[in-house]
Amino acid sequence: ILPILSLLCGAMLTEAASGVSDAGDPSPGVVQELWFGIPGASVKDLTHGKIFDTAASAVHTVSSLDVENLGDQYGARYSALLRVPVSGKYRLYLSSDDSAELWLGKDATQKDMACIATVKGYSDPHNWSNQPNQASEPVQLEAGRFYFLVVIHKEDGGPDHMSVAWSGPDIPSPVIIPSTALFVPPGVLPEDKPQPPAEAD
């Protein structure tokens, strides 16, 4: 069972894609969706606005959940399938400036997502203990399975960063999740989404 920080999180996570139970052999990477021109430092400034229901200003595939200095007054959603190398209990850690929320699914879909870590305001880069809810409770993850992971990040002004780390079997202290454990979820990239039929001339 995933621990839920629903009272601390925005609790308005919307799906970037439907996801599939059997992810097959997805491509490595993380989908980064960016919305620009949004003031405020709270995640709710992004998720509670109508703009979050519209197409992102920009969509990229990045190699990791470790980014910095993308600009001011923007919001971001990062989507990936997480696959651990060894079965066991893992903790996930979140660091960001400004605020962020870390959500994890029970499988490769977004059907049962839980908010497992948060940053309110900001934390120092790669500091996993500035705030009490930056680290998740231990979560049992099985090798070979995919788990849908989402980070919602909101930046107002000044320096900005967002990172996700893990600890677990043979990983005694937090390290940035390696790119070898992150994969692009099917259906998230714009070219993967169904397009309306072209109108006849």
Question: What does each model-identified segment do?
Answer:
Residues 17-201:
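Acidic/polar, compositionally biased interaction segments
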